[in-house]
A protein has these predicted regions:
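Helix N-cap motif at beta-to-alpha junctions
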Residues: 108-110
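Short hydrophobic/aromatic beta-strand micro-patches
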Residues: 104-106
Length: 147
C-alpha cells in the first residue's frame, strides 16, 4: 500500500504576488473549473496601546500543523465538490503589508469554491497550531490572538 504524502503548506517568508499569480495561471488548463475563490491574509499595521505593529513572526509545531491541515483538507473535499485546494502559510518574520496566508479553492461552480474557501480559512485560524508574535516598531512584542 502506498504511503500517504502530506502536503507542506509552509513557506519561509512572505507569500509573493508573483507566486500567487503563477498559481492562478496554472489553472487555465483545468477547463472543468468554473469558479475560484481566493483568500489573502495580509499583516496589518495595527496600533495597540499607542504602538504600531511593524511585522508578525510566525512559528508552528510543524508536524502537528501539517497533520491537522491534511485532516481539514480531506474534510473540505468530502463536504464540498471542490476540484482543487491550495493553502500556503508563511513562517518567519513578515512585514506589515505583506501576504502571510494564501488559500485558493476551485470548483465547477463559484458558490462551492467560495464556501469551501471561507470554511477553510476559518478552520485554519481556529485549529492550526501556528502562532504569531506581533513585533512593534520599538522592537517590543506581544503574542497575537487569532480572531
Amino acid at each position: 500500500m502506498k504511503e500517504k504524502v502530506i502536503k507542506n503548506i509552509f513557506v519561509e517568508g512572505a507569500i509573493e504576488p508573483a507566486f500567487i499569480a503563477e498559481s492562478i495561471a496554472k489553472h487555465q488548463t483545468k477547463t472543468n473549473i468554473g469558479g475560484h475563490s481566493i483568500f489573502l491574509g495580509q499583516v496589518r499595521a495595527d496600533v495597540i496601546d499607542g504602538r504600531s505593529v511593524s511585522a508578525i513572526e510566525y512559528t508552528t509545531y510543524n508536524q502537528m500543523a501539517l497533520e491537522k491541515m491534511d485532516q481539514i483538507r480531506e474534510e473540505m473535499f468530502n463536504k464540498y465538490s471542490i476540484t482543487c485546494m491550495h493553502v500556503y502559510q508563511s513562517l518567519g518574520k513578515i512585514s506589515a503589508g505583506q501576504v502571510c496566508l494564501f488559500v485558493f479553492t476551485s470548483s465547477k461552480h463559484r458558490k462551492v469554491a467560495i464556501d469551501a474557501c471561507e470554511e477553510t480559512v476559518e478552520r485554519i485560524k481556529a485549529e492550526l497550531p501556528v502562532w504569531g508574535k506581533e513585533i512593534f516598531e520599538d522592537e517590543s512584542y506581544q503574542w497575537k490572538e487569532n480572531n
